[in-house]
Amino acid sequence: MKKKTYQNVKRGYWNGKWYDSSWELALIVYCHEHGIELTRNTKKYPYKWYNHIEYYQPDFILEDGTFLEVKGINDYRAKRKVSSIPFPIKVMTYKEMKPYLEYMTLKYGKDWRDRF
């Protein structure tokens, strides 16, 4: 099965933290500006996919140990990955990300993605 790739995705570092999308950037900026400790996760967890083992790496960890996964599309495979984590995990779909995206637009303007 071919992996999906997305063009024009914003990636890079902000304030020493790596982000893989503008949604992740919005979350990082919000947490930084509100004193919420957010750490990039580096651990991978195995999950079974079509009779072989794949590895899943959630995006972030909060200081209470909760994993955060920023996910634009929460399809079957994404749900399968998330279910492989033996720890609390919160999937941040558009509904959960909307307040952070609105925060960025209100504070930095509609073009905030281009300005960071």
Language-model features, listed with the residues they occupy:
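Electrostatic, structured charged patches in enzyme active sites and in nucleic-acid/phosphate-binding
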Residues: 1-116
